[in-house]
Amino acid sequence: MPRSAQETERIRERELRIVRTARQIAEQDGWSAVTVRRLADAIGVSQPILYRHFPGGRDEIVERVVIDGYTELAAAMRVPGDGADTLPALVAAYLAFAREHPAVYEAMASARTGIVFASSETPAILREGFGMLERAVGGESDRDRAVRAELLWSTLHGISQFAAHDRLDAALDDVREDAVAALFARHP
């Protein structure tokens, strides 16, 4: 029997609440604190109800957080301009996202999920975000653009990780962002 629109919306709202609660727990206490039991208790449902929404349990919830995180990051990186003109704002948006959402960024960077990267099976939102990096750094060929985008992504990730662990001087954030943008600016 088909679900009513009201039932479908109720299910969607509960799933959003589960994911939002997982993010809150992770931001407060780290990902190791995110368990099915704690999530069920926090939102006031039984564990079987939670599994009904996410049959893969915690792993499926974390994967959803990762996809949502990449969706939010892509939205943040949609900056005005085209190509290399977007590089400074894109660098700033990426680093701000990682700084403002440390637990989500941690999951995006290191959680073991079923998400496939650098493949035709990569989710569209991840390909879109990577495409923004490719267009910003440019290159003489598809391969050159992909490598330059991977290097930019790796650089931004490294900065994000060092900053998250207080290994960089926060007073230099703007200078660092400008330096990364200049480093990856296209050269004729």
Regions found by a protein language model. Name each.
Residues 1-13:
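N-terminal intrinsically disordered/low-complexity leader segments
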Residues 14-22, 39, 65-73:
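Generic hydrophobic, amphipathic alpha-helix propensity
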Residues 17, 21, 25-60:
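Helix-turn-helix
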Residues 65-89, 118-127, 133:
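Amphipathic alpha-helical linker/stalk segments
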Residues 88-109, 118-121:
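Helical hydrophobic small-molecule/effector-binding pocket
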Residues 109, 115-151, 173-185:
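Amphipathic alpha-helical packing segments from all-alpha helical-bundle domains
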